[in-house]
Amino acid sequence: MRKLRNKDILKVLREIAEYGIPEEILTDHGTQFVAAKSREKVKHILARVRLRESEKFGSVEAVVGWHNEIKPHRSLEWDELCNAFWCKLPPD
């Protein structure tokens, strides 16, 4: 597993500035987020040990892609976001 670099941290901080403080954070039982999550009332979700679910995607971009293109969403009657988006576009 690769180590976090300064540019990774800066990217996360920019995204928090743009989108706001997250409601939940999934971690690998590390202590880096403990103080911040307590202060900001962020739900701390711990990844299961040895199952490495937090590494499944390899990057934030992969998680966002999965969420937007593959994951079925209950609010869309179990359709994917991209299908719901394309279906609502007016015909050419």
UniProtKB/Swiss-Prot annotation:
It comes from the Archaea. GO terms for molecular function: nucleic acid binding. This is Uncharacterized protein AF_1071.
